[in-house]
From Swiss-Prot:
Belongs to the pantothenate synthetase family. The keyword Nucleus does not apply. Transmembrane segments: none annotated. It is an enzyme of class 6 (ligase). It catalyses: (R)-pantoate + beta-alanine + ATP = (R)-pantothenate + AMP + diphosphate + H(+). Signal peptide: none annotated. It comes from Syntrophotalea carbinolica (strain DSM 2380 / NBRC 103641 / GraBd1) (Pelobacter carbinolicus). Beta-alanine binds at Q61. Its main location: cytoplasm. This is Pantothenate synthetase. Pathway: Cofactor biosynthesis; (R)-pantothenate biosynthesis; (R)-pantothenate from (R)-pantoate and beta-alanine: step 1/1. Keywords: ATP-binding, Cytoplasm, Ligase, Nucleotide-binding, Pantothenate biosynthesis. The active site is at H37 (proton donor).
Length: 283
C-alpha cells in the first residue's frame, strides 16, 4: 500500500489504472477508522481492481463551535487498518493541499441540505459536497462507498453526482453497529462510560418506533413523540432533531410507508450522535 500526500501523484496512479482497464473503488473518510469504515473498504475491494481510500479531516464542514481541533486523529493506526483490508492507495492530503491560498470555489446542493443536519449545522453540507467533489475529480472512481448512518449525506452526494454528471456510482451500505446496537462512529470515543450507556437510548427508541409501526401505528407525529419521550428520559440527552422523512426527498411525512426513514441527532453530554432506520424495516 502506498500513502500519498500530493494530488498529482494520486491522479497519475489512478490514470494509469483506468488506462489499464481497471475499475477504481473509492472510500473517503476523515480517519480514526472503525469497523464501519473497514466494511466499506472490504466491499470496495470486492467491487474494484484498484482500491483507494482517503483520510482528510475536512475543515470546511465544521462550524466555528464544532470539534475540528479535537476530532480524533491517528494516521499510524489507520494506515495499519487499511493495509490489512487491502487498500492500494491511501490519500492523506493536508488542508493546504486541498484548499490552497486563494481558494474560492464551493459546491452547494439546494433543498436536501436545508433540513435535518443542514438546519442545525449551517454550511456543513457545503463543506462535505465541496471536498467530496474535489476527491471525485482527483481519484475519478467508478464507484464510491458510504455508510447509511450518514443518511442525509448519502442523499446529498447522490444528488450532487447526478446533477453534475459525475461518472461515479455512489453506493450506500447498511449502518455497522456495536454488539449492543450503537451505531459505530469515530465520535463514540468521546463518550464517558455513563454517557455510553445513555447513548443506547437512541437504539432503543429506534427499536420501539419500528415495533409500534409494525403493530399498525403509521402516524409519523405519534412515532416521533414515542422516540422523543424515550430519549428524554436520559439526563444528559439533548435532542437536536427527530424526524420521519421520505427516504428520497428527505421531506417530512404525515403517514409512514416503506420508504419512510426515522432520522435523529442527539447530543449526549458534549458528543453529537446521529442514527436512522427505515421505519418499516424488519425489527
Amino acid at each position: 500500500m502506498d500513502i500519498i500526500n500530493d494530488i498529482a501523484t494520486v491522479q497519475s496512479r489512478c490514470l494509469q489504472a483506468r488506462q489499464a482497464g481497471q475499475r477504481i473503488a473509492f472510500v473517503p473518510t476523515m480517519g480514526y477508522l472503525h469497523e464501519g469504515h473497514l466494511s466499506l473498504m472490504r466491499e470496495g475491494r470486492k467491487r474494484g481492481d484498484l482500491l483507494v481510500a482517503s483520510i482528510f479531516v475536512n475543515p470546511t464542514q465544521f462550524g466555528p463551535k464544532e470539534d475540528l481541533a479535537s476530532y480524533p486523529r491517528d494516521l499510524e493506526r489507520d494506515a495499519e487498518l487499511v493495509r490489512e483490508v487491502g487498500v492500494d492507495i491511501l490519500f492523506h492530503p493536508t488542508p493546504a493541499t486541498m484548499y490552497p491560498n486563494g481558494y474560492k470555489t464551493y459546491v452547494h446542493v439546494e433543498g436536501l441540505t436545508k433540513t435535518l443536519c443542514g438546519e442545525s449545522r449551517p454550511g456543513h453540507f457545503r463543506g462535505v459536497t465541496t471536498v467530496v467533489c474535489k476527491l471525485f475529480n482527483i481519484v475519478q472512481p467508478d464507484i464510491a462507498l458510504f455508510g447509511r448512518k450518514d443518511f442525509q449525506q448519502l442523499a446529498v452526494l447522490r444528488r450532487m453526482a447526478a446533477d453534475l454528471n459525475l461518472p461515479v456510482e455512489v453506493v450506500g451500505l447498511p449502518t455497522v453497529r456495536e454488539k449492543d446496537g450503537l451505531a459505530m462512529s469515530s465520535r463514540n470515543v468521546f463518550l464517558s462510560a455513563e454517557e455510553r450507556k445513555q447513548a443506547l437510548a437512541l437504539v432503543d427508541a429506534l427499536r420501539q418506533a419500528r415495533v409500534a409501526a409494525h403493530h399498525g401505528e403509521h402516524h409519523a407525529r405519534r412515532l416521533v413523540g414515542l422516540v422523543r419521550e424515550r430519549i428524554g428520559r436520559e439526563p444528559d440527552a439533548q435532542i437536536d432533531y427527530i424526524k420521519i422523512c421520505d427516504g428520497d426527498t428527505l421531506e417530512g411525512v404525515d403517514r409512514i410507508d416503506a420508504n419512510s426513514v426515522l432520522l435523529m441527532a442527539v447530543r449526549i453530554g458534549q458528543t453529537r450522535l446521529i442514527d436512522n432506520n427505515y421505519i418499516l424495516e424488519e425489527v
